[in-house]
Amino acid sequence: MRTLRRLKFMSSPSLSDLGKREPAAAADERGTQQRRACANATWNSIHNGVIAVFQRKGLPDQELFSLNEGVRQLLKTELGSFFTEYLQNQLLTKGMVILRDKIRFYEGQKLLDSLAETWDFFFSDVLPMLQAIFYPVQGKEPSVRQLALLHFRNAITLSVKLEDALARAHARVPPAIVQMLLVLQGVHESRGVTEDYLRLETLVQKVVSPYLGTYGLHSSEGPFTHSCILEKRLLRRSRSGDVLAKNPVVRSKSYNTPLLNPVQEHEAEGAAAGGTSIRRHSVSEMTSCPEPQGFSDPPGQGPTGTFRSSPAPHSGPCPSRLYPTTQPPEQGLDPTRSSLPRSSPENLVDQILESVDSDSEGIFIDFGRGRGSGMSDLEGSGGRQSVV
């Protein structure tokens, strides 16, 4: 009896329940089909609007607002994740083909003039309109502007015979070509420096001189044999990995010791006889590094390169430890006989970094050098040391 009762309550669903489920499933399927059809219609409207912009047709009134709403709706659907791929593979590719077909077979000066006109149209009309149409997509990387400029670089700038046109004698380069190359070289891809970017740099070197590229400084006379100073400095720091990388802050040897001596107050001589008390302040002198060799002019080159009566205290770069208080500066050097050898700025930077690498505690500077004998008895404690 109990088994029969269980079978009675565990009976299969009735036909009426099946009839109710079939219309619900059909309704869901119809809703899905309608949403897909609406999304396809939105895709088509965006496609037609973008192609019309590349074809110089423009957009009708209120069309920009409709396209913005369509982009917002697509981003909420399952097709929103493929929006960037669709923008690159469909819209931008077709648009660049439209612009390229007009100048594809041009050469020489005609290519330069036609490419300049194409860039003006793209940069002034097409690019702002693309950013306006896809305004809801802003904030995502890569941006619409970056994608459009990269496609223009690959599909137009690097696909035409621009290098041959620039290499011709007496070629007149329009200002728009220079602007185009400079704007495009400022756009970078997420994967770093690519072969297309290096090809673009070779074009920039033909119209901009000097030009600091990825592999060094270039000019119209040819590439220099050395890179910029900043590059050597960064490579030096990355190899050493010592105090400069770990502790880039300025440290004092004693945190209780100030970097400069306090200002001393004393009365001037003869002030007591007059009955008036005039206080004068003695300013603490801080010894600075001598002028680097590479930046000093040899004697006999005008007023800027002529040495006066002041002798050169030291002929080398700034040492890691300056002279102490008791050691006087070198005297008796003949400025007319001593010719300072020239040194490039990068060698000066290397020498300074070597002096930093040799001492783990930092660069010690003694502020007591160069003081007069009358100042020593007033200041008392002498020069103080600090670490740079």
Curated annotation (Swiss-Prot):
Polar residues bias spans: 336-346
InterPro entries (UniProt xref):
Bit61/PRR5, Cullin_repeat-like_dom_sf
Question: Per the record, what is one GO cellular component?
Answer: TORC2 complex
**Tissue expression pattern:** Most abundant in kidney and liver. Also highly expressed in brain, spleen, testis and placenta. Overexpressed in several colorectal tumors.
Does the keyword section mention Electron transport? no
Compositionally skewed regions (Basic and acidic residues) per UniProt: 18-31
N-terminal signal peptide: none
User: Which residue ranges are recorded for the region named Disordered?
Assistant: 12-31, 254-388
- Enumerate the UniProt keywords alphabetically: Cell cycle, Phosphoprotein, Tumor suppressor
Gene Ontology biological process:
cellular response to nutrient levels; cytoskeleton organization; negative regulation of apoptotic process; phosphatidylinositol 3-kinase/protein kinase B signal transduction; positive regulation of cell growth; positive regulation of phosphatidylinositol 3-kinase/protein kinase B signal transduction; TORC2 signaling
Phosphoserine occurs at 252
* Chain spans, region Interaction with RICTOR: 10-95, 188-218
Please state which protein family the record places this protein in: Belongs to the PROTOR family.
Function as written in the Swiss-Prot or TrEMBL entry: Associated subunit of mTORC2, which regulates cell growth and survival in response to hormonal signals. mTORC2 is activated by growth factors, but, in contrast to mTORC1, seems to be nutrient-insensitive. mTORC2 seems to function upstream of Rho GTPases to regulate the actin cytoskeleton, probably by activating one or more Rho-type guanine nucleotide exchange factors. PRR5 plays an important role in regulation of PDGFRB expression and in modulation of platelet-derived growth factor signaling. May act as a tumor suppressor in breast cancer.
Subunit info?
A: Associated component of the mechanistic target of rapamycin complex 2 (mTORC2). Binds directly to MTOR and RICTOR within the TORC2 complex.
Name listed for the protein in its UniProt record? Proline-rich protein 5
Classification of source organism? Eukaryota, Metazoa, Chordata, Craniata, Vertebrata
